[in-house]
């Protein structure tokens, strides 16, 4: 691969990275899946073989893509083959949330299996692209995309404070028959204050939190202080349980690696305590409205999540043993958590493989400061998905997976010092 072609690949991703976090805008409004990032992802499957001529990293790219597709097809075909022979099995879809809710009778090769597979293909294409071609100079464009998303979110919140109406003029994505907006305008009332929950161009506040959490963590570990502070503020403005649980998980991970005396841990704890002491009544109402009511099932969101989880787990327990192992097929159901969604769709095999995909780099990467950031990002993403965000198709997830896998074979090249609690120095 000559220099010119390598430059084309670099520039291709730099443009892609800027729009990668955006999910509520469609280039072609009446065609689902035509977000700018998805178009870049799917086109890359054609562009890379042409530019690399199946040599070098291009060969590795094709190998990784085909390997993933092979595993995916095998798992689903095995599951579908069993279902086609088990003529006595007639699942009751009335208790679970199926993606294609117009069809409650088809068991084998449901339409949603194929439509959802296209989204997964875009996600995997992103993963193998970044895994094989990532360069550190891409980071500036990765952060640029995250900051643009955050700036637009701040604009929306400010617009609502001034004019008391939705200021989103970009989102155009819809679901179902076109009557359900892909961008949910939500407010939260805390005392006499009414705030719009920051969502930007991701659809809803929890999805913004899910998208931006790994960028925030990675910015800290790249020592991008201003960017990490800005993203932290936007995460707080989501008033999303996903954001707060993610922050708590990251704090615990920092304590695990760097101890309680770590400057960032101390800073977060001290700032949190000061804010709580100065605004105790406000904080009490805030925590009650955003976390406690949901966890205690006192609001509609918490009740719905708990019921869907239990319904999907009951549905899974009543499946034939072989189907419990290999699942009903990818894209059949979508609960409010990835754990029960994975078990129903792809069984124990799918759950185990998905878990290994995330934790292999967590155990393989050495403990450089940057690598610890990638590990923390993957852990936060994984548990956020399992608990509250059953969303596999957000490309930010696959971006950070690709970066982590890319760093495994060359972990001792750019960052050749293994940092520990005793010798890690963190600049303020």
Identify the residue ranges that each predicted region occupies.
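Interfacial loop-to-transmembrane-helix boundary motif in multi-pass membrane proteins
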Residues: 9, 61-73, 121, 125-172
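N-terminal hydrophobic segments of proteins, predominantly signal-anchor/transmembrane helices
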Residues: 9-28, 45-122, 381-384
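Transmembrane alpha-helices of multi-pass inner-membrane enzymes
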Residues: 18, 45, 377-384, 391-428
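Membrane-interfacial helix-loop-helix modules of multi-pass inner-membrane proteins that assemble, modify
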Residues: 83-101, 151-201
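Alpha-helical transmembrane segments of multi-pass inner-membrane proteins
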Residues: 120-125, 139-163, 190-239, 245-256
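Hydrophobic transmembrane alpha-helices and their immediate junctions
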Residues: 223-225, 248-255, 262-266, 346-386
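Flexible juxtamembrane loops connecting transmembrane helices in multi-pass membrane enzymes
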Residues: 276-310
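TM-adjacent membrane-interface loops and short helices in multi-pass inner/ER membrane proteins
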Residues: 300-334, 348-351
């Amino acid at each position: 691969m000559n220099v010119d072609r390598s430059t084309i690949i670099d520039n291709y991703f730099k443009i892609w990275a800027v729009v990668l976090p955006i999910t509520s805008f469609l280039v072609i409004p009446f065609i689902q899946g035509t977000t700018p990032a998805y178009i870049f992802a799917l086109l890359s499957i054609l562009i890379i073989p042409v530019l690399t001529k199946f040599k070098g990293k291009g060969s590795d790219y094709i190998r990784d893509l085909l390997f993933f597709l092979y595993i995916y097809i095998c798992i689903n075909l095995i599951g579908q083959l069993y279902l086609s022979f088990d003529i006595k099995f007639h699942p009751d879809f009335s208790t679970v949330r199926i993606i294609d809710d117009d069809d409650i009778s088809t068991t084998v090769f449901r339409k949603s299996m194929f439509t959802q597979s296209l989204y997964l293909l875009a996600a995997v294409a992103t993963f193998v692209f970044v895994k094989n071609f990532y360069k550190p100079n891409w980071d500036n464009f990765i952060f640029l995309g995250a900051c643009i998303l955050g700036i637009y979110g701040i604009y929306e919140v400010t617009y609502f404070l001034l004019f008391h109406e939705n200021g989103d003029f970009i989102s155009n994505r819809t679901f179902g028959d076109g009557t359900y907006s892909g961008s949910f305008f939500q407010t939260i009332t805390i005392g006499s204050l009414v705030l719009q929950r920051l969502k930007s161009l991701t659809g809803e506040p929890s999805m913004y939190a899910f998208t931006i959490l790994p960028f925030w963590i990675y910015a800290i570990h790249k020592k991008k202080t201003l960017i990490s502070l800005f993203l932290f503020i936007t995460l707080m403005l989501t008033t999303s349980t996903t954001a707060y649980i993610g922050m708590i998980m990251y704090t615990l991970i920092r304590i695990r690696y760097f101890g309680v005396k770590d400057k960032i841990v101390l800073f977060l704890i001290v700032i949190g305590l000061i804010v709580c002491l100065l605004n105790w009544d406000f904080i009490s109402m805030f925590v009650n409205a955003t976390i406690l009511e949901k966890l205690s099932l006192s609001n509609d969101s918490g009740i719905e999540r708990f019921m869907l989880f239990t319904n999907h787990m009951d549905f899974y327990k009543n499946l034939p043993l072989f189907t419990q192992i290999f699942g009903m097929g990818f894209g059949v159901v979508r609960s409010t958590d990835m754990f029960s969604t994975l078990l129903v769709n792809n069984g124990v095999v799918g759950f185990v493989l998905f878990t290994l995909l995330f934790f292999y780099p967590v155990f393989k990467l050495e403990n450089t400061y940057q690598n610890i950031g990638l590990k923390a990002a993957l852990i936060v993403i994984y548990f956020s998905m399992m608990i509250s965000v059953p969303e596999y198709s957000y490309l930010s997830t696959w971006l950070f997976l690709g970066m982590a896998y890319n760093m495994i074979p060359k972990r001792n090249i750019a960052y050749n010092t293994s940092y520990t609690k005793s010798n890690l120095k963190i600049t303020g």
